[in-house]
Amino acid sequence: MPKLRSATSTEGRNMAGARALWRATGVKDNDFGKPIIAIANSFTQFVPGHVHLKDMGSLVAGAIEEAGGIAKEFNTIAVDDGIAMGHGGMLYSLPSRELIADSVEYMVNAHCADALVCISNCDKITPGMLMAALRLNIPVVFVSGGPMEAGKTKLSDKLIKLDLVDAMVAAADSSVSDEDSAKIERSACPTCGSCSGMFTANSMNCLTEALGLSLPGNGSMLATHSDRRELFLEAGRRVMALTKRYYEQDDVSALPRNIASFKAFENAMALDIAMGGSSNTVLHLLAAAQEADVAFTMDDIDRMSRQVPHLCKVAPSTAKYHMEDVHRAGGVMGILGELDRAGLLHTDVPHVAADAGGNLKSVLAKYDVMQTQDDKVKQFFMAGPAGIPTTKAFSQDCRWPSLDDDRREGCIRSREFAFSQEGGLAVLSGNLADNGCIVKTAGVDESNLTFTGSARVYESQDDAVAGILGGEVVAGDVVVIRYEGPKGGPGMQEMLYPTSYLKSRGLGKACALITDGRFSGGTSGLSIGHVSPEAAAGGTIALIENGDRIEIDIPKRSIKLAVSDAELAARRETMLARGPMAWKPLSRQRYVSMALKAYAMLATSADKGAVRDRSKLED
């Protein structure tokens, strides 16, 4: 049987000092020998998705200790991408993912914890903790803070649903009055929780369910609803069950690398494509797969994007549905159930919600609202919003009058009635992106599935924003924002402001945007990101000139710079002649801290998940 990792610091005369310190944290004589469960919390008052997490660790700890474990909590950092947006703060967002992963690894390994509960929520926190959990490969359960309720307000006597992006677009639209803009801003984010649409945070929390590492409802149950409390308690109980299975029964199926297998990554990607998740999820799944030593690549994503239909359309792709509506329709388990009936899901994989010997099939039998016979499960998915602004978790217990089980015209569709037979994300490739790039097709209007336009090139997001607002960009342009990749930014900024401002100026369907940076989960429109290789790594995007014709064909998965090979070769020679300034922006003025320079030295392009280049670290 595997020995408890914590025995390293709790057994033997040579560990008398360590035991003395453990005692000072509250450990008693009869506690030694029990498994020590680390609780990685990410509470912070900076982030609405985390502002309510302060007491969640205590909830989980109570369940752990009741089940026979010792619970020890620590915190990680958490960056709010929305607050960091539009200024130099966004340079720190993606690099914070690596810091979070490292900090969890450091704490767990330094203190020899036996298992782990990850309390996450927003954009880089769930991916960072996921990377750490797969790196550590000890029993783990994820439980997130949950999504906020959708904003709601009346404009022109019409009640509308809102989110963060609506506030940004309205503020930049000169046709919207100051009064209406302020009204939208005050209504857009009414409660604690991750932003209410299918943005990056909610997408990633949904994907942990599909990977098998979190409980049903984790991705969709509102932060404000009292039912969410049980998820935290059950996370504590489940991690103890997994811990006992591994350390007492030598059951390796309880370990995250055996749960998050290649099949599980395919399930997660199938879910992502079906629900039109944030394009950032591609970046994070690729990074997590590398930590798990799973050979899941852009080629797999490309293949699956052609097979999996788009079954669930949620804000920002539509104003009609938000996460509260996804939950009413059955949440992640509802979407997975439809994928299963379409023959597009592996159900023979382990899941933390399954008992020993169980798998995803047994979890779906209980939690898919279209097949369950459990009235408690149906009540669980009827949990709805209260419409009361609050920063408190579990503050309301409102319920919808019924489930949304309409698979023809509801929030979640069956394959037969899918929004489209090809999914909500696509991988494009061509001479402009030799290693691929990503477009969130769920947010692209049908009229823009093919697009040809003239390049309007900017070497920073700031310059692009100034150009868009200053009238430089006109209908038919393809806005190219380069040197914003993981290495070139550094930090791979999100481009939510440029896409929002294109919309506010009436160019949302008249222009395309291409970048080696990335997009917020709140982005929609013909926005193509993650261009690889990035400009700073010698990618063709660095060679584009103003006026070049760019051809985009999403159905054919193609993106082409209509410039001859000979001309591109000549431009490449000219670039190389710059010497030390080759593959660097000439006009951009940007302060880059030592911390960001250190990140850039090891960063890979987006097709590798923007993780560290291991070849530079190996002996």
Swiss-Prot record:
Protein name: Dihydroxy-acid dehydratase
Pathway involvement of the protein, from the record: Amino-acid biosynthesis; L-isoleucine biosynthesis; L-isoleucine from 2-oxobutanoate: step 3/4; Amino-acid biosynthesis; L-valine biosynthesis; L-valine from pyruvate: step 3/4
GO CC annotations, alphabetized: cytosol
Biological role stated in the UniProt entry: Functions in the biosynthesis of branched-chain amino acids. Catalyzes the dehydration of (2R,3R)-2,3-dihydroxy-3-methylpentanoate (2,3-dihydroxy-3-methylvalerate) into 2-oxo-3-methylpentanoate (2-oxo-3-methylvalerate) and of (2R)-2,3-dihydroxy-3-methylbutanoate (2,3-dihydroxyisovalerate) into 2-oxo-3-methylbutanoate (2-oxoisovalerate), the penultimate precursor to L-isoleucine and L-valine, respectively.
Quaternary data: Homodimer.
Positions bearing N6-carboxylysine: K124
Biological process per Gene Ontology, one example term: isoleucine biosynthetic process
Classification via Gene3D superfamilies: IlvD/EDD C-terminal domain-like
Cofactor dependence: [2Fe-2S] cluster; Mg(2+)
Binding positions (Mg(2+)): D81, D123, K124, E494
Family (UniProt): Belongs to the IlvD/Edd family.
EC number: 4.2.1.9
UniProt-annotated catalytic positions: S520 (proton acceptor)
